[in-house]
């Protein structure tokens, strides 16, 4: 049964396999010429790796805590930057969405204005066309009107003449009645005047006769 002894401080990195006899004779019996008891094995890479593994835990006490704390810090920093990026992304998306909506509204308003302008132009053209159609038969209409005007005047004269005659008749009747009433008044006035004169004339003879009779009476007495 062989045992391996590792010498980490050995520069050559030689590992020596010892037997039980060598373990019992630690004084170095190999100096006596006994070479079959031990075999030299070159395990330099394995020894270096083992020595590094043994040295790293000794030297990495503080860096271990630093390494354990650094992922937390990196995660916290990554979380903060991630939140900032998310907010920025949301703002960018909302701004693009708002710009898109504003563009849609502006396009809709422009289309409505164009439709209104086109409708106004169509109405204007229709009115011009109707006005032109109405203005074309004006000479014929003027001729017809020139023919119809005398007829209308005749009709008006025929319709107005009876009314005028009726009004004239009524006015004449009023004047005749007024004239007939005025001679009656004059006659009554004249009759009253004649009656007064007759009374005066009748009174004067009576007075004279009474005076004469009174004188005769005085004379007879």
Curated annotation (Swiss-Prot):
Compositional bias annotation for Acidic residues: 192-202
Gene Ontology molecular function, alphabetical: potassium channel inhibitor activity; potassium channel regulator activity; transmembrane transporter binding; voltage-gated potassium channel activity
GO cellular component: apical plasma membrane; voltage-gated potassium channel complex
Cytoplasmic side: 108-221
Pfam families per UniProt: ISK_Channel
Protein localization: Membrane
The organism's place on the tree of life at top rank: Eukaryota
Region (Disordered): 58-77, 175-221
Tissue-by-tissue expression: Predominantly expressed in embryo and adult uterus. Low expression found in kidney, small intestine, lung and heart.
Chief place of localization: membrane
Alphabetically ordered keywords of this record: Glycoprotein, Ion channel, Ion transport, Membrane, Potassium, Potassium channel, Potassium transport, Transmembrane, Transmembrane helix, Transport, Voltage-gated channel
Function (record text): Ancillary protein that functions as a regulatory subunit of the voltage-gated potassium (Kv) channel complex composed of pore-forming and potassium-conducting alpha subunits and of regulatory beta subunits. KCNE4 beta subunit modulates the gating kinetics and enhances stability of the channel complex. Associates with KCNQ1/KVLTQ1 alpha subunit to inhibit potassium currents.
PANTHER family in UniProt: POTASSIUM VOLTAGE-GATED CHANNEL SUBFAMILY E MEMBER 1, 3 (PTHR15282), POTASSIUM VOLTAGE-GATED CHANNEL SUBFAMILY E MEMBER 4 (PTHR15282:SF9)
Assembly description: Forms heterooligomers with KCNA3, inhibiting its activity by impairing localization to the cell membrane. The stoichiometry of KCNA3 and KCNE4 in the heterooligomers are 4:1, 4:2, 4:3 or 4:4 respectively. Increasing the number of KCNE4 subunits steadily slows the activation KCNA3 and decreases its abundance at the cell membrane. However, a single subunit of KCNE4 is sufficient for the cooperative enhancement of the inactivating function of the channel. However, a single subunit of KCNE4 is sufficient for the cooperative enhancement of the inactivating function of the channel.
Name of this chain's protein: Potassium voltage-gated channel subfamily E member 4
Natural source organism: Homo sapiens (Human)
């Amino acid at each position: 049964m062989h045992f391996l002894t590792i010498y980490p401080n050995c520069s050559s990195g030689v590992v020596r396999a010892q037997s039980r006899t060598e373990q019992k004779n630690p004084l170095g019996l190999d100096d006596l010429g006994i070479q079959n008891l031990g075999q030299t094995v070159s395990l330099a890479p394995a020894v270096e790796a083992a020595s590094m593994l043994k040295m790293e835990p000794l030297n990495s006490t503080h860096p271990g805590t630093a390494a354990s704390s650094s992922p937390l810090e990196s995660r916290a920093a990554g979380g903060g930057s991630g939140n900032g990026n998310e907010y920025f992304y949301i703002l960018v998306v909302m701004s693009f969405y708002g710009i898109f909506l504003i563009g849609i509204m502006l396009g809709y308003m422009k289309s409505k204005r164009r439709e209104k302008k086109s409708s106004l132009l169509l109405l204007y053209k229709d009115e011009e066309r109707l006005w032109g159609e109405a203005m074309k038969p004006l000479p014929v209409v003027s001729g017809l009107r020139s023919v119809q005007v005398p007829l209308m005047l005749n009709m008006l004269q025929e319709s107005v003449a009876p009314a005028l005659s009726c009004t004239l008749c009524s006015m004449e009747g009023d004047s005749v009645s007024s004239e007939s009433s005025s001679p009656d008044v004059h006659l009554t006035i004249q009759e009253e005047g004649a009656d007064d004169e007759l009374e005066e004339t009748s009174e004067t003879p009576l007075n004279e006769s009474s005076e004469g009779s009174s004188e005769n009476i005085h004379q007879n007495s």
